[in-house]
Structure formats: structure tokens, C-alpha cells
């Protein structure tokens, strides 16, 4: 019989299965509502609103809950009221106090990068089929929301890895950390 290992794409191996199911549910739900909503609901406006609500729920849930629970990353935007400058703030859990489940990590990053790619494909399809502008605007909104989360979490992950590398380099052998980092990336 096939033995399941941590890191396999099986939601039962998740450390946070409810969080993972809601995360994937919002992501898949918005795509399915966009693709098949008109087959079950005759009112276009209702399909548009339901898709928009699912996209908004996905954005909020990923940004504030799933990112923190599944991979220990969180981001937000702060605006300086006196100057009007906007700064992105990244937060990551301490790797010494929290271990990230490999299954959660795989689901998170795979879904994070696959969803914008699917929406880009749907945008190209909408342009080729010359659908109404309103459908294309919905895809545009979906792209803005999913790409924003993708870019923010990618930056947050890079920031997290850089700060972990810097702190471990100061406390231990920099050569072993550099070697481990290079070979770890190549053979992951």
C-alpha cells in the first residue's frame, strides 16, 4: 500500500486542514463561479456579484488568516498620514519557534502561483472570444486581487529567508549557511 508522506498533496496531512479547505475553497470557488455560474444562475449580475464576493473573501482570508496559519507569513500596507507614503510591511513567524508543515507549504505556494496563471488564461480567452467588457472587467479585478497577494507573499517569503539567513550567519558559520542555502535551493 502507498505510504503518505508529509509534503504530499493530501489535505489530510495538513497541520491546519480547516484553514486549508477554506483557502482552497475560496480560490477554486471563485474560478468555478466565473466559469460555470451562468449555467446554474440565469442572472448575470448575480453571477458577477457572487464571483466578486468569493474573490474578496479569498483575498481577505489568504492575506489575514491562511498565510499566517499555513506558512507563517503575513503582510499589510501602512500609509503615513503626514506624507501620504505607502509602505508594505512583512511579518514572518520565527523559524526557531514554529515549524511549517510541508503539505501546507506545498498547497499554499502551488495555489498562490497557479491561481493568477489561471486568471491570466481566462483573460486571454475573454479577449479572444470578444466577450462583453463586463466579463473582462471581472477577470481584471480577479487578476488585481490574486497578483497583489502573490507579489506580497513572494516578497514576504524573500524577506523572511533573508532575515533568517542574516541572523543565522551572524550566530554561526556563514560558509555552511551559504552552501546549505545554494544546494538547498538547487535540490529542493
Swiss-Prot record:
Gene it is expressed from: TVP23
GO BP of this protein: protein secretion; vesicle-mediated transport
A Pfam entry, by short name: DUF846
Protein name: Golgi apparatus membrane protein TVP23
Cellular component, GO annotation: Golgi membrane
Subcellular location, record wording: Golgi apparatus membrane
Sugar-modified residues: 80, 101, 177
Transmembrane feature ranges: 13-33, 35-55, 108-128, 133-153
Superkingdom of origin organism: Eukaryota
Family recorded in the similarity comment: Belongs to the TVP23 family.
Topology within the bilayer: Multi-pass membrane protein
UniProt function note: Golgi membrane protein involved in vesicular trafficking.
Keyword annotations: Glycoprotein, Golgi apparatus, Membrane, Transmembrane, Transmembrane helix
InterPro entries according to UniProt: TVP23-like (IPR008564)
Amino acid at each position: 500500500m502507498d505510504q503518505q508522506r508529509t509534503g504530499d498533496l493530501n489535505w489530510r496531512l495538513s497541520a491546519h486542514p480547516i484553514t486549508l479547505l477554506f483557502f482552497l475553497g475560496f480560490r477554486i470557488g471563485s474560478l468555478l463561479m466565473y466559469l460555470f455560474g451562468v449555467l446554474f444562475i440565469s442572472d448575470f449580475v448575480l453571477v458577477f456579484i457572487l464571483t466578486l464576493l468569493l474573490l474578496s473573501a479569498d483575498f481577505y482570508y489568504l492575506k489575514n488568516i491562511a498565510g499566517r496559519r499555513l506558512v507563517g507569513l503575513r503582510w499589510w500596507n501602512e500609509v503615513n498620514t503626514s506624507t501620504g507614503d505607502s509602505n508594505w510591511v512583512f511579518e514572518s513567524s520565527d523559524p526557531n519557534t514554529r515549524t511549517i508543515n510541508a503539505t501546507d507549504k506545498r498547497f499554499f505556494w502551488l495555489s498562490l502561483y497557479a491561481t493568477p496563471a489561471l486568471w491570466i488564461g481566462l483573460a486571454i480567452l475573454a479577449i479572444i472570444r470578444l466577450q462583453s467588457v463586463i466579463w473582462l472587467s471581472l477577470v481584471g479585478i480577479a487578476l488585481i486581487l490574486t497578483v497583489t497577494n502573490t507579489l506580497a507573499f513572494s516578497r514576504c517569503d524573500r524577506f523572511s529567508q533573508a532575515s533568517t539567513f542574516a541572523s543565522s550567519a551572524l550566530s554561526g558559520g556563514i560558509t555552511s549557511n551559504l552552501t546549505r542555502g545554494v544546494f538547498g535551493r538547487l535540490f529542493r
